[in-house]
């Protein structure tokens, strides 16, 4: 490969070498302070994310080591979930992880409230939003434990074909 960087196999699961190189160039452009990782502010410089109310949650999900920034490996692994070659299960798990803020494998009433609050802002009162959250939990919670498991989440979301919309063209 000469002077070109090689990447661990687990980083390349859904991208070919040309796509990795393009993502590498994009990462370098985004890394304004040349630190080797992307801060929230650097992520926000992406026009397609600037006005996304869930951008901080996306960054939290990408940031697998929890240091508050996204390094190149985390960037590749995170964006890989949006690859057209990515599978339905992986995309559903990513969508679930946006809501599962404490990473315990369940979406609690409080987590659903927080994420929906990010999306609706002040368009609903907290009382209205809580009513929506409570109804959603009642409908999706098939085993009656008061929270939504991945299986309960995916049973509903799979039918909406969300995985077909979670695509990034590299």
UniProtKB/Swiss-Prot annotation:
InterPro entries, alphabetized: EF-hand-dom_pair, EF_Hand_1_Ca_BS, EF_hand_dom
Amino acids binding Ca(2+) 3: 100, 102, 104, 106, 111
- Function field: Regulatory subunit of calcineurin, a calcium-dependent, calmodulin stimulated protein phosphatase. Confers calcium sensitivity.
* Residue ranges the record marks as coiled coil: none
Please name the PANTHER family in this protein's record.
Answer: PROTEIN PHOSPATASE 3 REGULATORY SUBUNIT B ALPHA ISOFORM TYPE 1 (PTHR45942)
The protein's superkingdom reads Eukaryota
Query: Which positions does UniProt annotate for Ca(2+) 2 binding?
Result: 63, 65, 67, 69, 74
Q: Which GO terms describe its cellular component?
A: calcineurin complex; cytosol; mitochondrion; protein serine/threonine phosphatase complex; sperm mitochondrial sheath
Q: Where is this site: Interaction with PxVP motif in substrates of the catalytic subunit?
A: 118, 122
Protein name, UniProt field: Calcineurin subunit B type 2
Gene3D superfamilies in UniProt: EF-hand
Q: Which residues form the EF-hand domain?
A: 18-46, 50-85, 87-122, 128-163
